[in-house]
């Protein structure tokens, strides 16, 4: 359609200019005087429809090619103004009182009519290589899109509702500071020597990890603190458990991650890892039989504060 309209407009340039100007002036006089008459076809290869009668506001017919602007509507009866001709035709503007989106414009055409006051509408995109969408409505903040690169910084969560931060990729990434009142754990930065801070009292939430050489488990639910999951790496130290529900940190062994222990059952700290995996000690308050023989030849050490195996 665009190519056809452009070609017709270029062919009708020489003959359409003079005749279309004369016809448009005569039609404007007819409409203003209150006697609407049928429009004569303007010069070129694109005839036009007759104008709508007064009293019934309708959109004017589209104008094509390089023809001049149509006549204005009569006073006292608002109608949408016809678009000014560029190299392409354009549909009619929306009716007053019923806001609708005007049709998009393409190419080198002029801008369509603005939306009616009192009822905001999105403006139609202007043709060319620079199109812009409608601005977001105030009162509903939206998060900016993530920025990529080697030094990206995530956006802070909205106040009042702390949530986990999205993972940040890159070699030098730094998360935003937590909001006062509801402390959150800052995410550890990647490397081979990571140190996980102790969880603050209240509602601790753990943000997802940042890119590096180690993996980190999902954050625990607020109100139910759990032991932190193990970290991969050569030298990892586990965090201290929050006050109120003592739990032992999970078993750490080399480069083999292991899931966190279940909440609600206090356990002593299992032996720290070598390469052979050792069984966990029985929970306090529930004495059990002797543990199974260890794997790898190292005998298991009894946990602190628990009864020795009978």
From Swiss-Prot:
The keyword Glycoprotein applies. Residues 48-63, 133-147, 196-210, 217-231, 258-310 have a biased composition (Pro residues). Residues 1-16 form the signal peptide. Residues 35-234 are annotated as: 9.5 X 21 AA tandem repeats of K-P-[EQ]-[GR]-[PR]-[PR]-P-Q-G-G-N-Q-[PS]-[QH]-[RG]-[PT]-P-P-[PH]-P-G. Residues 14-310 are annotated as: Disordered. The keyword Metal-binding does not apply. Keywords: Glycoprotein, Pyrrolidone carboxylic acid, Repeat, Secreted, Signal. SMART domains: Pro-rich. GO terms for cellular component: extracellular region. N-glycosylated. Proteolytically cleaved at the tripeptide Xaa-Pro-Gln, where Xaa in the P(3) position is mostly lysine. The endoprotease may be of microbial origin. Pyroglutamate formation found on at least Gln-46, Gln-48, Gln-67, Gln-88; Gln-90; Gln-193; Gln-288 Gln-214 and Gln-295, preferentially in diabetic, and head and neck cancer patients. It is found in: Secreted. Glycans are attached at residues 66, 87, 108, 150, 171, 192, 213, 234. Its main location: secreted. Sequence repeats lie at residues 35-55, 56-76, 77-97, 98-118, 119-139, 140-160, 161-181, 182-202, 203-223, 224-234. InterPro entries: Pro-rich. PANTHER family: BASIC SALIVARY PROLINE-RICH PROTEIN 4, PROLINE-RICH PROTEIN. This is Basic salivary proline-rich protein 4. The lineage of its organism: Eukaryota, Metazoa, Chordata, Craniata, Vertebrata. The gene is PRB4.
